[in-house]
Amino acid sequence: MDMETETAQVKVIAHIRSDFSTKFGIPRQSGLVDELTARIVFTPPYRSQAALRGLEGFSHLWLIWEFSKARREEWSPTVRPPRLGGNQRLGVFATRSPFRPNPIGLSCVRLAGIDLHTPEGPVITVAGADLMNGTPIYDIKPYLPYADCRPEALGGFAPAPAGARLAVDIPPDLLARVPEDKRSALTGVLSQDPRPSYQHDPERVYGMAFAGLEVRFQVEGDRLKVVSVERES
């Protein structure tokens, strides 16, 4: 075997359907916004009820997926984590950067439901996912608390969530434009401060695509105010 050219093939078993049509605004890690729900729709070869037998006994799942919008021809051994302001380089294997030799992501999500009888076969609903709509999924595995939870673990340069949650102000007339079942998720996403960590201009207006809407907002101090909500073009 030639280790210089060794490769492997993986199969896309499913795609996720989420409220994010672009990368901006997606929580930086899974589980930060539990109100976010997404659906896992299997590709035709894997639309098997039998493949999900026993899954209902678990509360959380691991998703193994592809950073499909972050492909690069060449990889770099160091990257600039946004958490550090984009100015400091760390080894790619010491980060969760999408720009990796293999653009593979790993997310822990809550199992919110299983519908075995849909026109597209069995569909899994999950909560707390940090994936863009259409992201390819390579595998699904159950989360095992006794093996996967390590209270003694160290978090390196990211021992805790970045910064405090923002207070979110959505004027009533704008909130009325958001479907009722999406309001708590939108508030949760905005409270995480979707801005790049190096941008703090209180006059700047940011736009985020969410659930078919274009949500524009400003941030001043620890307060985020939504200034417009329109249908996504």
Where are these regions (language model features)?
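Mixed-charge, low-complexity intrinsically disordered regions
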Residues: M1-I104, L116-T125, A129-S233
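Conserved positions in beta-strands of structured domains
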Residues: R17, V109-A112
